[in-house]
């Protein structure tokens, strides 16, 4: 056996000492003082940032919401069943991030951006902070491109443009979610990525929405974020911010996105719950003073960017539920003042068979004609006024029976226009078909058709056009306007169809 030389031993030891690295992990650690209702009070984290992600030794995570002199109020994701007094909490020195990009499209995620659809992990290296500054004035461009919903009453009377924030407001069970889902279904082939954020909804309702989107092939370009009623208030509060971060990725990469928040009433309630547990002073309706700010900073992130920034857009459709039609409550008035218009859905209209139950008088788009193609403007120019006069006459006829001819004519035309604007759920209509049927109603082609048969007239008109005169629809689609020749051709087609149509 060969003896080890002294020099060899010393050189090996020297080499080991030279290459030795002390593998220690430096972390700022605090202790939980108290934990209740999803909020932990933590002592010993003096350098923590506002809304920094913190890790508990139990594996739970949370964000630092209240930074006090001697403690930190931490909102815990999930229910934190194993967190108790004395549990260690360490800083991550990073703010809340979610996965973004094409990898999330077609998936159902929770508020933290984790998949909950059983289709495996999201493979992406791209993450984005959920709290971002909204684009400034100079980075924006005025809304000028239409975002068609496929709903006649909206595209003709309260048009939505790319980059707009349009509120959908109404009592429960008036078809608010259906309007939003129709808008998502209608984006097929339009190169618009859609994000549906469900806040405080029943799991069964969200599953139904996902099934509908899959049925109409809309999941291919959609993301669903679910913070259901069974999730903690923290998850419900975070969900819309995670959703908008995903939408911003497409906006900032010169693409177009549409985000639906369903609904912000429940979001405000979740935030109220968190704030009261954090012992922040309550204000009107027990909401904290900054409840306006949580919604304004969320909705301001929807924008149409200027050409220098890539001309991308993020359109927001927030939904708010009212109680007994009271739009003057705290949260509805807040969000009405933040958004660029509202679509008001009414219970009375819904139960009288007018669906979508849009109250044309109270609904408004502050973008207006800028978000419409010229053809729609041409056919629906006086539609709002005509419907308003019809409603006035209708109220008058309840007291007076004898009407002059002009009033009778106006009343009959109005009844037919109300029928024209009716639409079945999940059946959005291409803009060229909308132009044709609204033109037919506005120009008196439906005057001889009985009111009950207007919907049937429309159902037969579209296949007739597709079979015999597809060029009419194609021309409206490409020209986006009705010139003299096209209008003459459209009149001829409608007259021909009226001869063949039998009630």
Curated annotation (Swiss-Prot):
A Pfam family this chain is assigned to: ATP-synt_ab_N
This enzyme's EC code(s): 7.1.2.2
Group of enzyme by EC: translocase
Keywords: ATP synthesis, ATP-binding, Cell inner membrane, Cell membrane, CF(1), Hydrogen ion transport, Ion transport, Membrane, Nucleotide-binding, Translocase, Transport
Gene Ontology, cellular component aspect: plasma membrane; proton-transporting ATP synthase complex
Binding site for ATP: 170-177
Subcellular location: Cell inner membrane
Membrane topology field: Peripheral membrane protein
Catalytic activity reported: ATP + H2O + 4 H(+)(in) = ADP + phosphate + 5 H(+)(out)
Record-annotated site: Required for activity: 363
Xref: CDD domains: ATP-synt_F1_alpha_C, ATP-synt_F1_alpha_N, F1-ATPase_alpha_CD
Example GO molecular function: ADP binding
Disulfide bond entries: none
Top-rank taxon: Bacteria
Recorded family membership: Belongs to the ATPase alpha/beta chains family.
Quaternary structure (record): F-type ATPases have 2 components, CF(1) - the catalytic core - and CF(0) - the membrane proton channel. CF(1) has five subunits: alpha(3), beta(3), gamma(1), delta(1), epsilon(1). CF(0) has three main subunits: a(1), b(2) and c(9-12). The alpha and beta chains form an alternating ring which encloses part of the gamma chain. CF(1) is attached to CF(0) by a central stalk formed by the gamma and epsilon chains, while a peripheral stalk is formed by the delta and b chains.
NCBIfam families cross-referenced by the UniProt entry: atpA, PRK13343.1
Function of the molecule: Produces ATP from ADP in the presence of a proton gradient across the membrane. The alpha chain is a regulatory subunit.
PANTHER family: ATP SYNTHASE SUBUNIT ALPHA, MITOCHONDRIAL
HAMAP family: ATP_synth_alpha_bact (MF_01346)
Name of the molecule in the record: ATP synthase subunit alpha
Gene: atpA
């Amino acid at each position: 056996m060969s003896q080890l030389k002294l020099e060899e031993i010393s050189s090996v030891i020297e080499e080991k000492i030279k290459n030795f690295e002390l593998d220690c992990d430096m972390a700022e650690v605090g202790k939980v003082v108290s934990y209740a209702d999803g909020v932990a009070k933590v002592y010993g984290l003096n350098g923590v940032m506002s809304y920094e992600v913190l890790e508990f030794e139990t594996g739970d995570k949370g964000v630092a919401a209240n930074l006090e002199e001697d403690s930190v109020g931490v909102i815990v994701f999930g229910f934190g069943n194993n967190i108790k007094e004395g549990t260690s909490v360490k800083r991550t020195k990073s703010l809340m991030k979610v996965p973004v990009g094409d990898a999330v499209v077609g998936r159902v995620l929770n508020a933290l951006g984790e998949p909950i659809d059983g289709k495996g992990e999201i493979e992406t290296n791209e993450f984005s902070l959920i709290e971002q500054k909204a684009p400034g004035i100079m980075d924006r461009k005025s809304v000028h491109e239409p975002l068609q919903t496929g709903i006649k009453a909206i595209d003709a009377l309260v048009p939505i443009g790319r980059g707009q924030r349009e509120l959908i407001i109404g009592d429960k069970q008036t078809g608010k979610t259906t309007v939003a889902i129709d808008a998502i279904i209608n984006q097929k082939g339009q190169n618009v990525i859609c994000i549906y954020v469900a806040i405080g909804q029943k799991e069964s309702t969200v599953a139904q929405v996902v099934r509908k989107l899959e049925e109409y092939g809309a999941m291919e370009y959609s993301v669903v974020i679910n913070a259901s009623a069974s999730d903690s208030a923290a998850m419900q509060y975070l969900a819309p911010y995670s959703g908008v971060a995903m939408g911003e990725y497409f906006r900032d990469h010169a693409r177009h996105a549409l985000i639906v928040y369903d609904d912000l009433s429940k979001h405000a309630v979740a935030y109220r719950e968190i704030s009261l547990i954090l012992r922040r002073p309550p204000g009107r309706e027990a909401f904290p003073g900054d409840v306006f700010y949580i919604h304004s900073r969320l909705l301001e992130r929807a924008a149409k960017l200027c050409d220098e920034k890539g001309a991308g857009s993020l359109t927001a459709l927030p939904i708010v539920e009212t109680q007994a039609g009271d739009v003057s409550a705290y949260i509805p008035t807040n969000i009405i003042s933040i958004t660029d218009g509202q679509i008001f859905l009414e219970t009375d209209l819904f139960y009288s068979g007018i669906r979508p139950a849009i109250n044309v008088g109270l609904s408004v788009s502050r973008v207006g004609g800028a978000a419409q193609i010229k053809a729609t403007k041409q056919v629906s120019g006086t539609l709002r006024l005509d419907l308003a006069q019809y409603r006035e006459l209708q109220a008058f006829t309840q007291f007076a029976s004898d009407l002059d001819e002009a009033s009778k004519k106006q009343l009959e035309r109005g009844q037919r226009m109300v029928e024209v604007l009716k639409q079945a759920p999940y059946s959005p209509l291409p803009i060229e078909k909308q132009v044709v049927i609204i033109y037919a109603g506005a120009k008196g082609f439906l005057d001889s058709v009985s009111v009950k048969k207007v919907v049937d007239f429309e159902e037969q008109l579209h296949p007739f056009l597709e079979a015999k005169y597809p060029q009419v629809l194609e021309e409206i689609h490409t020209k986006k306007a009705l010139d003299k020749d096209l209008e003459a051709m459209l009149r001829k087609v409608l007259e021909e169809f009226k001869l063949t149509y039998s009630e």
